[in-house]
Amino acid sequence: MTIPTTVSVAPADEYPADGHTMTDKLTATLDKAGVRAISTDLWGIFFEDISYSGDGGLNADLVQNGAFEYNRADSIDWSNYSFWRKIVPAGSFAAFDVLTDNPVAEENPHYASVEVEQAPASLENIGWDGMVFRAGETYDFSAWMRISSNCEASALPVTVALIDDDGNAIAEQDITVDSNDWRKQEVSLTVSGESNAIVVHEGALRLTFTTEGTVDLDFVTLEPRTTYNGLKHFRPDLVKALADLQPRFMRFPGGCITHGLGMDNMYHWDRTIGDVEHRPHNFNLWRYH
C-alpha cells in the first residue's frame, strides 16, 4: 500500500519563526505482511527535561549557557552571563558586553563581546555545579569567534584551558582569532594520565584573552571524546544505563515540555533539526533552558 502524505521540512538555514511550516512531498510504502500486533505490556522509558536530564545530563556538552541566551525574561535568576565568571586580575582592565548585531544565527542572536584594554582577562564557565575531568580523556572545544569590527587588530590570541579544583590549568591550547567574520574555532585538550579516573570534580573551562583588543564569541562547547557505541554528543555512562534497561519504547517528548507555557514555548520538533546554531533556544516549566 502506497500512501502519499505531506510532512513539514525545515532546511538547516531556514527556520520559520511564526509557527508556519514549509512542506515537501514524502511517499511511504507499508508492507501488510510485516504488520504484527504490539503487546500491551511493554517496558519503556520516558524523557522529560527535569533534574537536568537533557542539558547537564544526556547532552555531553560540559558548558552551560554557551550561547549566552539565558535571560531574565525566562527566569529572574538568569542573565546572559549566567554560569560564566569574569576574571580581571589586578592591573588589568576589561569590559564584558552582550550584543546582538550581526550574530552567528538570527535564531539565537546574543553573543559575548570582550574588550580588553589592559591584558590579560578571562571568561570562565563552571558548567553544571562544576566540570568533571578524567585522566586520559580528550575534550573537544569549539566556539564561534571574530575580531570586533571596532578593533584594529589583525590577530588576537586566546588561551583555552581546563581548570582544576584549585584553579590551576591541567590542559591548555592557544588559538588565534584573525578575522572580522565569524569563524568556528576548534581545539582538543587532553588530561594527563591513563586511568580514566576522575581527577577534577569542580573544574571549569577558561578562555584567556592575552592581548589588547575586542573579541566576540558565541556557541562555546566542550565535550569529552569518549562515546557509547560511537553516539556523539551524548554522555556515554547515561546512554549505557538507559540501554541496559532494554526498553522496548521511549516516550518523547513527555510531561509539560509537550505543551509548555503556550504555542511559542511548547516543543516543536522541526526546530530541533539542522545545525545547532540555528535551533532556537527555549526555556521550560522546570526552569531549565
Spans of features found by a protein language model:
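Extracellular and organelle-lumenal recognition/adhesion modules and their flexible linkers in secreted
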Residues: 2-289
